[in-house]
Amino acid sequence: MPCTTVLAGKLATNDRSTMIARTDDGHFDEKKLIVVEPDQQPKIYKSVESHVEITLPENPMRYTSCPSVDPKHGIWAATGINAANVGMTATETTTSNPRVLAADPMVELREAKDGEEERCGGIGEEDIVVLVLPYIRSAREGVLRLGALLEQYGTYESNGIAFSDENEVWWLETVGGHHWIAKKIPEDRVIINPNQFGMDSFDLEDAFGARESHLCSADLREFISENHLDLNQDGKFNPRDIFGSHRDMDHIYNTPRAWFMGRCLAPHTYRWDGENADFTPESDDIPWSYVPERKVAAEDIQYLLSSHYQGTPYDPYAGHAEKGGIYRPIGINRTGVTTICQIRSDVPDAIKGIEWVCFGSTTFSAWLPVYTNVPQMPDYLSNVTLDAETDNLYWVSRFVGALADKCYGSCIQNVWGYQDTVNIRGRQIVLKYDRLMRESGDFTLAAQANDELCAMAKEESTQILNKVLRTASEQMKNGFSFADTCVNK
């Protein structure tokens, strides 16, 4: 998927939680948030896209999932948190280069033709969450399981995948059809990744030694050497230069997003604007990781992932005729779902996992926190139809975005108020139920909390829909200033 990812280590956040977040920017895919119980997990998985068939381990865990409502192209689970409080988001579609893809080709489906049997493809975004998340008890285990699957079955696309637990965040990027490289995020860092191979440093000695913070395919050194992939002149190992891309397209689609996020996280650490800027929107060497100048909260990640270059000449809503809209924004119209998987360290195990869910274009939608260790999600999040309606948060968010976009200046203050109110009321409900569950020891109250959260979200989303619909109606092009009473006088 053409997505944007933000990862935060526990010392970079305001509450020592880990957070992994990603916009799932498909083709206006209808999405929902559900809980998958162990008896609902398949024993043999078959991909719709690649036809690969994989026998799954016994004893899967419960996990949350954001699958496509229409199953005709597969599950596309996107993201979730399992019962062991391990989070995962998959995938960030990334880039590669011809040298890598020639040396280790993608494993693509080859249909039966001219008497030849069908050859299955590898695994991809459609499959990865279902294949990995129910079976892992730490972020590191997620990397190792996915790495083994990539080596055995291969993949047909370049992807980045994030894993998190209470203490660690890991980022894995695929390299060609079967290779991979993964890094533990330093605890005090925030990572940004916009549809490009992002990792810009890697310790090969650690990966082939202690394996404390770096993991990779067993033959990665030989793969690089035998295929002359290392283009670096300074002796440093930079995976982005070796495995990634520096295309003209990156400079309008990918690097500008990194530039905007970097200037938010480290506005004074680097110079982002002017003739003497360290980095411009089209720089290929924008840093991948940052020690943020102040600790980040969930709302800061929300801001990054809903941005449209506000405060810059590239904002499509600001009326800059020359530059507005020339770069791909992060908050984009086709987003299906965005989540922040937050694993907290200051609450009991049963309620460590919080998933912040946002449907539709993040610029206009609200983020709702929900507890993940529950038997099912409320209908307002899980009962999403293919036909537009107003009984679920997905479609209401779509309506609000489509209406407010056309009259941005008139609607955006109401939208900001809606987003802030849902954040405030959502946090209040979580704080209340955290306290109740700690005091009572009854962690089944998490389901009741989610019901209350969704009732609040429905109330607030109905109000904002009423407001933007009224504003958009008043600004229709067929409006006329005379009323019937004026004509008849």
Regions found by a protein language model. Give the residues of each.
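A contiguous strand-loop segment
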Residues: 2-125, 145-278, 285
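Short, well-ordered beta-strand elements within core beta-sheets of diverse protein domains
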Residues: 129-135
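Substrate-recognition/cap regions that form aromatic- and gly/pro-loop-enriched pockets
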Residues: 310, 314-441
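Histidine-centered catalytic/metal-binding microenvironments
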Residues: 421-489
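Short, charged, surface-exposed loops that flank catalytic or proteolytic processing sites
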Residues: 135-141
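Short, well-structured alpha-helical segments that form the helix of a local strand-helix-strand
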Residues: 142-151, 301-305, 447
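Short, well-structured beta-strand/strand-turn elements
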Residues: 140, 153-154, 331
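Accessory, solvent-exposed terminal regions and/or long lumenal/extracellular loops of proteins
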Residues: 254-324, 328-333, 418-423, 427-434
